[in-house]
Amino acid sequence: NPRLTYLRELPNVHLLGPRPMVEVPDYLGRFDVCLDLQRRDRLDSDVIPRRIYEYLSTGKPIVTMLLPEQVEEFPDVIYGAHSLEEYDRMCESALAEDPTWVSPRRRDYGSAAAWSRRASEIQRILSGIGLY
């Protein structure tokens, strides 16, 4: 991928590959912008990756490349680009954003997706119909 080659050459970008989950929060704390790099040939491209919710929980800017058929799930808190040129512009915007209003909103999305919150919601629904 020519874009990855370009990114590897930047002094402030580090492509480290998979890391143990226990280390992820430390890495996320060091990000200025969370980049969502997706492969276009993935069959599950319509599924929101777990990392998006992890990124949201940091409150930091997120830039993702959208596939042509993909719907923007969080247009108010994630920068979604449809071309490489737009991706570059979105990264610049993300670095320059004022986080005062959007960071808490991102964290709200992230906490709403927490497994404990989801489990509580399922329990509430099942209790409401007498199955729990």
Go through the PLM ranges and name each one.
Residues 1, 18-22, 49, 84, ...:
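Structural motif corresponding to alpha-helix initiation and N-cap regions
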Residues 1-5, 70-71:
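Short, charged/polar "capping" segments at the starts of alpha-helices
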Residues 3-28:
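Nucleotide-activated donor-binding/catalytic signature segment of Leloir-type glycosyltransferases, i.e.
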Residues 22, 27, 36-56, 63-73:
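Nucleotide-sugar-dependent
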Residues 31:
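An anion/phosphate-binding loop that grips the pyrophosphate of nucleotide cofactors and donors
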Residues 99-130:
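A charged, aromatic-enriched C-terminal amphipathic alpha-helix characteristic of glycosyltransferases
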